[in-house]
């Protein structure tokens, strides 16, 4: 028996709604039990979505924060996600994007979290938001091999890199005078951890070829 779609009409009659957290699929089902039309929810400022059942999310132009997990976009870039001058926080987990193209449409973004995005390979577009970006977290995005764009992110205050990708070096830290915290589990190929010494809080995974241990690094928060 196929259940009728859930009726979201009452939701659209709430013009003062600012926050919406929406999961439309059960673990044992392949299809959502309805579709939310975000073109009819123009005043939202914070949205959290998961999986299928989300229509017209790019119409959300007043968002300050957007979080998505298991979301599948057509373009496989940030063109599939909300953007705008007000957007400051973006968190994407297990999504199908391949690049960050389109991030320049959110020129005031401050905080970007990228987690378990298995198809993401190209983060070079980050230089387009270097002026605004303050915090960047990249975790378990194994296809990213080129982190050279980090040299352009001179206003970062917090940087977290988690995964098995080898960083050639961490010389990019010298270009981040405002950096307060740096944490990584990634192997650093040249083994030189001295750039960490200038950072108030730094954490690395100990490896035999590193010239410093994690315990040698500052832990001031």
Regions found by a protein language model. Give the residues of each.
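Concave beta-strand-loop units of leucine-rich repeat
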Residues: 1-12, 16-56, 62-99, 105-145, ...
